[in-house]
Amino acid sequence: MAHKTFISYKYSEAQDLRDRIIKALGDDASYYQGETSDSPDLTDTSTENIKKNLKDMMYDTSVTIVIISPHIKESKWIDWEIEYCLKNITRKNRTSHTNGVVGVIMKVNGGYDWFKYTSTKLDGCSVTNYYDSKVYDIINNNRYNQHPKVYSCNQCKCVNALTGSYIAFVEEDEFLSNPQKYINNAYDKSEKDAEGYNLTKQR
């Protein structure tokens, strides 16, 4: 089943990946509610007008795709967009559902080591780590927040990459090869108002 999606991204460095994600959605791109290369330029518009346009795009969506790019934190909008998508917003007696969220890590210079690295636990388990300082607190606070936690390994206490965090991180190549898999995973976690996760909805 297709879900209405919104892509949150830093325009100056991620618009190409945004376009490739929309293309990878195939027929499901008709459910995409966010900006495209044909969207009007709002650069010189007031902050309130930009917010109104973004709210109109986001309100009816159920999954937010956040592009994790090197200068994401320089954006004035992304953390606000994530906060809006996580909240239950009421319009005309209808309350929106908390969105599922997936973070797509941009490939830079042919790889992802600008943001992720692997380490080995004492028991021999290999785990993926991330440079948390490169993303917003609202993203970090919704990582490893499954409740109760379900461990992939009870000895080293590592968790599943997709279900252990409300906001899972997925490499660009993996996401583009099967976007529906990761969109569905994000949506499934949002069911019953994200029951099973301790959500942080404030920036």
Predicted segments with their positions:
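A short acidic (Asp/Glu
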Residues: 16-19, 76-80, 112-116
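Short beta-alpha junction loops
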Residues: 71, 97-118
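Conserved RecA-like P-loop NTPase helicase motor core
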Residues: 88-94
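Conserved TIR/SEFIR loop-to-helix hotspot centered on a Trp-containing motif
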Residues: 71-88
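Conserved N-terminal substructure of TIR/SEFIR domains
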Residues: 1-63, 94-97, 166-203
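C-terminal interaction surface of TIR/SEFIR-family domains
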Residues: 4, 110-203
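Juxtamembrane transmembrane-helix termini
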Residues: 62, 68-69
